[in-house]
């Protein structure tokens, strides 16, 4: 009986060892992120990398902008009446509106999209006269009711409609040459008039067959006006097709024709670089922005956005994803609430995280004769935070490097195979989205691995300090074989623990405890032996009581056969 009491007392001594545990921060509800190895990894903290909101206005503070209003960019070159206030000028931001007017007399511009893009990317337009002169039999001031100006018939301001001076007279063969004496390329635009009927053609240019030829060192083309009836637009059944080319410095361009030509009055020089915005958003001179789209301004520091693939300025890359969460915390292991027994409230990082530790990523919990305590480890926490800080900026840098390479490759493809813009843009978006997902997943994997590594480094630091003075329990804790008060615990935390100071006490306690430790097999035998002995003692006591009662006549036993 005494042996059993001693064993129980010594086992209680084992359980009563001072204890220090290492753990990491945890939260009740973490955030799910994607890593290279797990698409549903829960972390303590994460930040969104995809911007989904914008300001519904154009922030123009600090910008020299030109709002074209009803004027279409093409109208700036040909001189549409709606563009009379925008024929020249400089800007850093050009704003195009949805219902802008490009043409008064109905028509179109060949390769209009490319020309419009050149204008929208420019930082201004200056004009130079072509110096073309015409004979006395040519009227260079043709007008139309479709292009009203100051209440009267007019025409495009930057080109001249050349017609016969006398109605029905054959237009004379005419040749004009423009030489670019500038050091920059000039953009020259001209038109071909397609009459609505033979009568109109004869009245304007005579009965002869019409032909226009245009040539420079880089451009050659011949045009024949097409006479046919067309639906009326602005009261006109005729059409004007505008053509354009770039004249290099020192080059000449020659026009030769006998009617049907809309001649340039001035050539344009696109100067500088600027932003071109297509938007119906109102202008706000009180806010700043570096990125714009049709819905307004995107003011964000995030590397990605899912608002539109068509943005201008210094913008986040478009990805076809609602969300890409970037881990800024460690793997989350919610705390398992345990009973408050002797060690019920203390468990290390191997078992679970600690939700109560809000002042650090890593820390300690201890229990000794003075009670329990908890403290963060600022060194390991700071080491982890230093690697997290700037992660978003590093992601942006990686994004820009990867995406600029992709964009360059696709720009070259566009240049080589022509008008495949929509196809290439869709392909770029798909690749950007894949690259974005991969980059974020890689960063998340690195963050989690790094956080785990810092936890293990801290654990190893404590293990090396304690040496044989403590034993690991397999749950992220150390059971200490000597008395360790609060100052002792503090020395372990701040890495100043003196192993030799407690060596003798720890060794003695270890020997005393180990001498009574039993293997699991012997423990089972003792338990069964104890159970059997208890049953035997109980049975003996009962039988003794029965015999005592029978002897004293207090109990009778009758046996019937």
UniProtKB/Swiss-Prot annotation:
Lipid-modified residues of type S-palmitoyl cysteine are 557, 560
Q: Where in the cell is it found?
A: Virion membrane; Host apical cell membrane
Pfam families per the record?
Answer: Hemagglutinin
Q: GO molecular function terms here?
A: host cell surface receptor binding
Signal peptide positions (record): 1-16
Q: Name the GO terms of the biological process aspect.
A: clathrin-dependent endocytosis of virus by host cell; fusion of virus membrane with host endosome membrane; fusion of virus membrane with host plasma membrane; viral budding from plasma membrane; virion attachment to host cell
Q: Site (Cleavage): which residue positions? A: 340-341
Q: Which GO terms describe its cellular component?
A: host cell plasma membrane; membrane; viral envelope; virion membrane
Per UniProt, subunit arrangement is: Homotrimer of disulfide-linked HA1-HA2.
Family to which the UniProt record says this protein belongs: Belongs to the influenza viruses hemagglutinin family.
Q: What else is known?
A: Major glycoprotein, comprises over 80% of the envelope proteins present in virus particle.
Q: What is this protein called?
A: Hemagglutinin
Q: Which organism is it from?
A: Influenza A virus (strain A/Chicken/Germany/n/1949 H10N7)
Source organism lineage?
Viruses, Riboviria, Orthornavirae, Negarnaviricota, Polyploviricotina
* Primary gene name: HA
């Amino acid at each position: 009986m005494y042996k059993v009491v001693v064993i129980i007392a010594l086992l209680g001594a084992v359980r009563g060892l001072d204890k220090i545990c290492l753990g990491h921060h945890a939260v009740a509800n973490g955030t799910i992120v994607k890593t290279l190895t797990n698409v549903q990894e829960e972390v303590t903290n994460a930040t969104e990398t995809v911007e989904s909101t914008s300001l519904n206005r154009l922030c123009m503070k600090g910008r020299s902008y030109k709002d074209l209003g009803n004027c279409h960019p093409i109208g700036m070159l040909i001189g549409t009446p709606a563009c009379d206030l925008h024929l020249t000028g400089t800007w850093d931001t050009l704003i195009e509106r949805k219902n802008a007017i490009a043409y008064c007399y109905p028509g179109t511009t060949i390769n209009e999209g490319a020309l419009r893009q050149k204008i929208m990317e420019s930082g201004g337009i200056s004009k130079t006269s072509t110096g073309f002169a015409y004979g006395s039999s040519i009227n260079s001031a043709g007008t139309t009711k479709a292009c009203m100006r100051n209440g009267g018939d007019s025409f495009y301001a930057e080109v001249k409609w050349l017609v016969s001076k006398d109605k029905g007279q054959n237009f004379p063969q005419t040749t004009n040459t423009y030489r670019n004496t500038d050091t920059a390329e000039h953009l020259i635009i001209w038109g071909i008039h397609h009459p609505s009927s033979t009568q109109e053609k004869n009245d304007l240019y005579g009965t002869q067959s019409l032909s226009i030829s245009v040539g420079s060192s880089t451009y050659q083309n011949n045009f024949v006006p097409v006479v046919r009836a067309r639906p009326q637009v602005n009261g006109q059944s005729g059409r004007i097709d505008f053509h354009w080319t770039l004249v290099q410095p020192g080059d000449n361009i020659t026009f030769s024709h006998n009617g049907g030509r809309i001649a340039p009055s001035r050539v344009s020089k696109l100067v500088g670089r600027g932003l071109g915005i297509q938007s119906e958003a109102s202008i706000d001179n009180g806010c700043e922005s570096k990125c714009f789209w049709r819905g307004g301004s995107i003011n964000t520091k995030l590397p990605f956005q899912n608002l539109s693939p068509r943005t201008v300025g210094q913008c986040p890359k478009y990805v076809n994803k609602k969300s890409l969460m970037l881990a800024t915390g460690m793997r989350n292991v919610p705390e398992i609430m345990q009973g408050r027994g002797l060690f019920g409230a203390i468990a290390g990082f191997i078992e679970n995280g600690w939700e109560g530790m809000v002042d650090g990523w890593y820390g300690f919990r201890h229990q000794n004769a003075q009670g329990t305590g908890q403290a963060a480890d600022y060194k390991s926490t700071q080491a982890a935070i230093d690697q997290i800080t700037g992660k978003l900026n590093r992601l942006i840098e990686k994004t820009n490097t990867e995406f600029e390479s992709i964009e360059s490759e696709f720009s070259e493809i566009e240049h080589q195979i022509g008008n495949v813009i929509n196809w290439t843009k869709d392909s770029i978006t798909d690749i950007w989205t894949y690259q974005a997902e991969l980059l974020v997943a890689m960063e998340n994997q690195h963050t989690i691995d790094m956080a785990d590594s810092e936890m293990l480094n801290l654990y190893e630091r404590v293990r090396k300090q304690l040496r044989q003075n403590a034993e690991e329990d397999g749950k992220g804790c150390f059971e200490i074989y000597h008395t360790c008060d609060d100052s002792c615990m503090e020395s372990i935390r701040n890495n100043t623990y003196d192993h030799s100071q407690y060596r003798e006490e720890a060794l003695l306690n270890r020997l005393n405890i180990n001498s009574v430790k039993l293997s699991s097999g012997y423990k089972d035998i003792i338990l069964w032996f104890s159970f059997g002995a208890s049953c035997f003692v109980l049975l003996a006591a009962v039988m003794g009581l029965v015999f005592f009662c029978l002897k004293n006549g207090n109990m009778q036993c009758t046996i019937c056969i």
